[in-house]
Amino acid sequence: MKYIIIVAALFLVSCSNGSEYQVVSKVPDLTMPTNGLKFEEIENYQNFKVVATHFRTDKNELRYVMVNEVAFNAFSDNELLPEGSKIVKIGWKVKEMSNFSVALEADKIQRVEYMIKDATRFKDNPGNWGYARFVKEANKYKSWDKGTASCIGCHNLARDNGFVFSKKQILF
């Protein structure tokens, strides 16, 4: 009976308005070889807010774009992203839905990429952005070993938007 009361109390506390659902994750211990960014800098990124989705036709990849609170506030106010902003992109391989063949759905994660705005560490990068990419192969992540020059080159196309392609997608 004592265990039932304890379980019931824990259930009630977890369902109260005072608690928030939080995902706690342990990311791999990986570091980008060219700039020292670590996967752990986005520990618990699953709690970031989704602001956009994209489909990369060249990679046949669906991307969820998630941001930390600092970036979310700027996205919400339609402002350039400030120091401390973090943007995470999750790239999913897509597959045809088994029960609705005219639709595609996310299948397997192919990559986790992120950008962090840090004027101290990335003062020589356009917009003070640092870039990291962790590719998933055979169910294991590895650091991207081809550098970040391609990230910087591509994001230069979005110079007028603070080197960020995404804009917050309105849900209504």
Where is each model-derived feature located?
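Positively charged n-region of N-terminal signal peptides that target proteins for export
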Residues: 1-4
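Hydrophobic helical h-region of N-terminal Sec-dependent signal peptides
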Residues: 6-10
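C-terminal motif of bacterial Sec signal peptides marking the signal peptidase cleavage site
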Residues: 12-14
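Sequence context surrounding c-type heme c attachment/ligation sites in exported
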Residues: 19-35, 39-45, 49, 53-59, ...
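Short, structured beta-strand/loop micro-motifs enriched in basic residues and often containing a Trp
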Residues: 62-72
